[in-house]
């Protein structure tokens, strides 16, 4: 883009051209930037149309301010904003939801300003009043209305019901399934014999312990079975099952007999049981 001179402003004011009578010193001073006249400027709205008022709380206390002023300098008022102490106790009576009568008493209010801003005169007066009357300095709590009391009682009942519901919802052992020490003692220590007999017979009963018979381990003992014992065992097995020597039986997984087949002489020789422990007679 080719640079060009910007268009001339319409509101531009030109300086007066120097006349022929102008001195050379005036020409050497140079030209000044033209300024617009002040009457062409847009009027500005003032920040406020009224004069500022003198705020008494923002200004320091004036010596002319007397008792008519609500501020009265930096001293505290000598009267409490609470009701006068001459007003005695007032009874607030209302009926609760259970047709009962509730009464609350409002204690007279003390002068709090003398405690916050004490003076020598006020200290003496307060000491005398405390000795005589013993007034309460702090204001008492406000009386409770019948509606607030009713709502508080309903809230307490709801909280108790909610706690009971939470206790019931918590999982626990049923009462009929709880095992006590007495029940465990009856299960483990009492036998049918003891229940049938009297308490005296239980005390005098002799305990008989039968000896436990332990079978002999043939692999750990040095004793050998004789041939007579072997033949006796063989005859007992043949009496129970005569086909035990030459018949093979097939059973399924349920233990039911599926098939029986007789063995050949070759199979008898192969499947013949062998004695693990031989006697001295067989060895020789």
Swiss-Prot record:
Modified residues (Lysine derivative): 268, 272, 274
UniProt KW keywords: Cytoplasm, Nucleus, Phosphoprotein
GO terms of molecular function: cyclin-dependent protein serine/threonine kinase inhibitor activity; SCF ubiquitin ligase complex binding
Modification type Phosphothreonine: residues: 5, 33, 173
Residues with the Phosphoserine modification: 76, 198, 201
Biological process terms in GO annotation: G1/S transition of mitotic cell cycle; negative regulation of macroautophagy
Bias kind Polar residues: ranges: 18-52, 61-79
Modification comment: Phosphorylated by cyclin-dependent kinases CDC28 and PHO85 in association with G1-cyclins, promoting degradation of SIC1 and exit form G1.
Functional description taken from the UniProt entry: Substrate and inhibitor of the cyclin-dependent protein kinase CDC28. Its activity could be important for faithful segregation of chromosomes to daughter cells. It acts in response to a signal from a post-start checkpoint.
Note: Present with 768 molecules/cell in log phase SD medium.
Protein name according to UniProt: Protein SIC1
Organism annotation: Saccharomyces cerevisiae (strain ATCC 204508 / S288c) (Baker's yeast)
Lineage: Eukaryota, Fungi, Dikarya, Ascomycota, Saccharomycotina
GN (gene name): SIC1
């Amino acid at each position: 883009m080719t640079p060009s001179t910007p268009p001339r402003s319409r509101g531009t004011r030109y300086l007066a051209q120097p006349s022929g009578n102008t001195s050379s010193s005036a020409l050497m001073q140079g030209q000044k930037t033209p300024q617009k006249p002040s009457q062409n400027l847009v009027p500005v709205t003032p920040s406020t149309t009224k004069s500022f008022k003198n705020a008494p709380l923002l200004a320091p206390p004036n010596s002319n301010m007397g008792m008519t002023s609500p501020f009265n300098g930096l001293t505290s008022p000598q009267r409490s904003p609470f009701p006068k102490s001459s007003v005695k106790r007032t009874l607030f009576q209302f009926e609760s939801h259970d047709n009962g009568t509730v009464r609350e008493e409002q204690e007279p209010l003390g002068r709090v300003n003398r405690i916050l801003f004490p003076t020598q005169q006020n200290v003496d007066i307060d000491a005398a009043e405390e000795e005589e009357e013993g007034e309460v300095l702090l204001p008492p709590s406000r009386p409770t209305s019948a509606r607030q009391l009713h709502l508080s009682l309903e809230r307490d009942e709801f909280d108790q019901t909610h706690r009971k519901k939470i206790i019931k919802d918590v999982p626990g052992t049923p009462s009929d399934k709880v095992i006590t020490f007495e029940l465990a003692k009856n299960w483990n220590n009492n036998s049918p014999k003891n229940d049938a007999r009297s308490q005296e017979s239980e005390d005098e009963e002799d305990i008989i312990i039968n000896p436990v018979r332990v079978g002999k381990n043939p692999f750990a003992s040095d004793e050998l079975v004789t041939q007579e014992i072997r033949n006796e065992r063989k005859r007992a097995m043949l009496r129970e099952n005569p086909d035990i020597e030459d018949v093979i039986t097939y059973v399924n997984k349920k233990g039911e007999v599926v098939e029986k087949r007789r063995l050949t002489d070759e199979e008898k020789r192969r499947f013949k049981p062998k004695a693990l422990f031989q006697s001295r007679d067989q060895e020789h």
